[in-house]
A protein has these predicted regions:
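Conserved N-terminal substructure of TIR/SEFIR domains
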Residues: 1-59, 82, 146-182
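Cross-kingdom TIR/SEFIR domain
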Residues: 23-36, 43-133
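C-terminal interaction surface of TIR/SEFIR-family domains
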Residues: 92-182
């Protein structure tokens, strides 16, 4: 049996509804190994345990709201230093100077969202793809892969729709084969 996938969710303190949406997205992913999840500690909670988890997690998921508040910077740096894959989401709100600086200096593509439900859909697809990308290392079974592909494929199929009808035709009953010579 595979070990649970270790996910650390680093988030701004102002994102209560968004953290709930992320939890729903994670719970909805059809994978057998399950999850071990830790979050950014709240004010007054011990940060050392969370930081140790970050360094050994499989994925870091960052959700940025109005502020890039402590200890988000330590969580980010710990994951980057350990070479962990990062999924980054940014709420379209007025950002503090610290959040603006984080958006500028981090070397990651931020996915923007406006509402918790939009974030849930984005995290479902993004996390499904991130888990698929590491499927062998995470010990996914074929059933896990099929379930995750079903979540990712609809988006891929929309992107690849042909512009018009397919007008390719065969040679019918005849054909010519040309041998290429240089």
């Amino acid at each position: 049996m595979s070990k649970p996938i270790r996910l650390f969710i680093s988030s701004s303190p102002d994102l209560v509804a968004e953290r709930e949406a992320v939890g729903q997205a994670v719970a909805g992913l059809p994978i057998a190994p399950g999850w071990e999840i830790k979050h950014t500690p709240r004010a007054g909670e011990e940060a050392l345990e969370a930081q140790a988890f970050v360094e050994h997690c499989d994925l870091l998921l960052v959700v940025l709201g109005a502020d890039f508040a402590a200890p988000m910077g330590l969580e980010w740096q710990g994951a980057v230093n350990a070479g962990k894959p990062v999924l980054a989401y940014c709420k379209q709100v007025l950002h503090s100077p610290a959040a603006q600086a984080a958006l500028r200096r981090t070397q990651v593509a931020w996915t923007e969202f406006r509402f918790a439900q939009q974030l849930k859909a984005q995290v479902t697809r993004g996390l499904a793809q991130a888990v698929l990308d590491q499927g062998e290392r995470l010990g996914l079974r074929m059933e896990d892969v099929e379930g995750l592909l079903a979540l990712v494929k609809p988006e891929e199929q929309k992107e690849r729709k042909p512009a018009g009808p397919d007008r390719r035709e065969g040679a019918g009953r005849g054909g010519v084969i040309l041998e290429g010579r240089a």
